[in-house]
């Protein structure tokens, strides 16, 4: 899953702005943006956040304070109603802390022919399966459509756009959603695919994209809310499958500390403890 970036030339996408919206773990969002920037030259890169000042300047990344983003509802409202005024390119690549460009060589110029592309959702009819907003390419047409008062329900914004209002967006706004085959080539979220994709979304895929020392350090930036989530448990399983038991143990410790002590979590903790003597722990990271 990890491309060889030493031999892969950077892709130039002057038509695309890269952005993330994050006030919970902006430091991780900034690192995810940097990982995408390592493979692609974008027209502009922006981190929308609130009340956060990076410890060191972020080279090539604009940081814009957008006021409080306290919930998923606030996130959806900004992406639909606030983001459009900040985007001046034909397209924007919307990402989150747990998704980034995976293989720039998998980019297809045909992606720009569509108004919305995101990783397909599983167990959905083809007509509403595209797709996830956590790593999604959106056109100006889509952004402007999101401002229409006809969109009354905003959250979750990707499901509202791609399921609830999709027919209306297609018929009244002329929005073109990418077909499944194009979306599968663009990104994945729920399950990894055998062929290369441009990007991905989902914390449970991180062990295949990052080394253990980096992942171990990333855990320190995540809020308790994450450790209580189903995604955290899926990440623990992925860490064990990737033979990263030390990082899995730390994640599960934080999960139990956050109040999640169900049998499955305790079982995963026991498995991690059994595996640790057989695999090297990650290097220590300075506070």
State the predicted function of each range.
Residues 48-90:
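Active-site-proximal specificity loops/subdomain of glycosyltransferases
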Residues 89-100:
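Short beta-strand-to-loop acidic/aromatic patch adjacent to the donor-nucleotide binding site
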Residues 130-247:
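Catalytic core and acceptor-binding pocket of nucleotide-sugar-dependent glycosyltransferases
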Residues 34-43:
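Short, acidic, metal-binding catalytic loop of nucleotide-sugar glycosyltransferases
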Residues 45, 97-98, 139:
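Generic structural signal for small/hydrophobic residues in well-ordered secondary structure
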Residues 1-34:
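N-proximal low-complexity "stem/linker" segments adjacent to membrane-targeting elements
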Residues 100-129:
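Conserved donor-nucleotide/metal-binding helix-loop-beta segment in metal-dependent transferases, i.e.
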Residues 273-287:
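Alpha-helical linker/edge segments of TPR/alpha-solenoid repeat scaffolds
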């Amino acid at each position: 899953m990890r491309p060889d970036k030493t031999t892969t030339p950077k892709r130039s996408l002057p038509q695309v702005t890269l952005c993330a919206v994050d006030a919970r773990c902006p430091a991780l969002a900034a690192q995810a943006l940097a990982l995408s920037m390592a493979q692609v030259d974008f027209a502009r890169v922006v981190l929308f956040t609130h009340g956060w000042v990076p410890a060191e300047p972020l080279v090539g990344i604009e940081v814009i304070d957008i006021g409080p983003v306290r919930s998923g509802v606030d996130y959806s409202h900004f992406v639909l109603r606030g983001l459009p005024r900040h985007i001046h390119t034909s397209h924007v690549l919307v990402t989150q802390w747990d998704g980034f460009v995976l293989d720039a060589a998998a980019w297809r110029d045909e992606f720009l022919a569509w108004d919305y592309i995101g990783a397909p959702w599983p167990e959905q009819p083809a007509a509403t399966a595209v797709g996830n907003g956590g790593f999604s390419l959106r056109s100006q047409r889509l952004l402007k459509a999101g401002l229409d008062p006809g969109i009354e329900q905003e959250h979750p914004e990707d499901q509202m756009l791609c399921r609830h209002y999709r027919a209306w967006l297609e018929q009244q706004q002329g929005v073109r959603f990418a077909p499944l085959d194009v979306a599968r080539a663009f990104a994945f979220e729920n399950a990894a695919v055998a062929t290369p994709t441009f990007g991905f979304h989902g914390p449970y895929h991180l062990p295949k994209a990052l080394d253990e020392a980096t992942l171990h350090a990333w855990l320190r930036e995540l809020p308790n809310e994450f450790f209580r989530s189903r995604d955290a448990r899926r990440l623990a399983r992925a860490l064990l499958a990737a033979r990263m038991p030390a990082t899995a143990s730390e994640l599960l410790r934080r999960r139990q500390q956050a109040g999640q002590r169900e049998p499955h979590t305790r079982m995963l903790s026991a498995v991690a403890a059994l595996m640790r003597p057989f695999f090297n722990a990650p290097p220590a990271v300075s506070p």
